[in-house]
Amino acid sequence: MATDQSAFVIVGGGQAGAWVARTLRSEGYQGRVLLIGEESHWPYERPPLSKTVLLGAGDDEGALLTAEQASALNIELWLGQRVIQIDRAAKRVTCADGRSAAYDKLFLTTGSRPRELPLAAEAPPDRIHYLRTRADAARLRSALRSSRRLLVLGGGWIGLEVAASASKLGVQVTVLEAAPRVCARSVASHVSTYLQGLHASHGVEIRLAAAVTALSAVGRGLAAALDDGSVFAADHVLIGIGVLPNVQLAESCGLAVDNGVVVDASGRTSDPDIYAAGDATNHFSRFAGKHVRLESWANAQGQAIVAAQAALGKAVAYDEVPWVWSDQFDVNFQIAGFPDQATGVLTRGEPSAGSGCWLMLDAAGAVVGAVAVNAPRELRGVRKAMQSGDPIDLSAWSRLAAA
């Protein structure tokens, strides 16, 4: 039972952490709320980093919790602090500088970190970029202002968003993707083909099945060598080859971890006094029919709200259709469900022409996901039907070949 004398501690100052803190207060919790974040910035949303922030948006873009809001809500923040130990028996966390805090309930919202490319160690470090934090974005933005050519290693969502932003700034961009198509882990081939065409129409070169074998300094820039003998030179390289969940703390204190911190539908870990939410968690999704680890803004926020409510004693469960979005050039993409599970595709409108929706079906003909192009209303309808289990009238959709 939460009391005015209890303490709820949140480790991680991103989307999930900020929403845990805000939800605790909106639900009426009066005890101590302490949020500990590794970054010195106040909590902020990450989606703008690859888009509006690179294009010049101010430092307050995507702010989740300002100093004024934290003061008004009586939320205590330790910023620029890294938690190095969780003592479950004593119910206490310890930071790298020696500070510690006791907790009644603990929330792990530690997020994820970019997967590093070992080959990058051979290249000039001032020319290599990853994108996860506001500091990363500021450094990349500065580099793009003085660059003519950018290499993007990885044709996933982050890589393509950065490619689009850099292209808008007048930078010549080449994307090197190891797979046979872009975003192959998350969408069907029809969507990949559209994405590739969109970027080509704006002058972005995409090389598929491109295996990078070396990165080396060339003059004041660097070059990437491929296994087919081709070489691509650039001023800077952005590496976007996925992320890894930050589960080190959870592992070190003995929590169940399996491709993320294992949580139940309410965000509880294997310790009933510790909850987790966001990119670092693994939960069962009825829409996938299995345990999944989701990397999205919406999942981080939704899980955080449920975890905070559950810690206060509410009988709640996180059960939402996965949803992500991406802005590239003048196109807004919205994705619901698990389109990568599709074996068949239906369309409404003309998504390949820039406005419409692909509806993804599995082998049994069930809807498993959707991808909308400049059609948010269409996507909302599909999400609502998937969430409720209501049937979707497929008579208004046109059938395409297998996904």
Where are these regions (language model features)?
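Mid-to-C-terminal Rossmann-like scaffold of FAD/NAD(P)H-dependent oxidoreductases
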Residues: A2-A7, S26, A280-P376
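Beta1-alpha1 glycine-rich phosphate/pyrophosphate-binding loop at the start
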Residues: A2-E76, S165-S186, G381
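Glycine-rich Rossmann-fold phosphate-binding loop(s) that bind the pyrophosphate
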Residues: G12-Q15, E38, R132-T133, L153-I158
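A conserved short coil-to-beta-strand element within the FAD-binding core of flavoproteins
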Residues: L79-A90, L208-R220
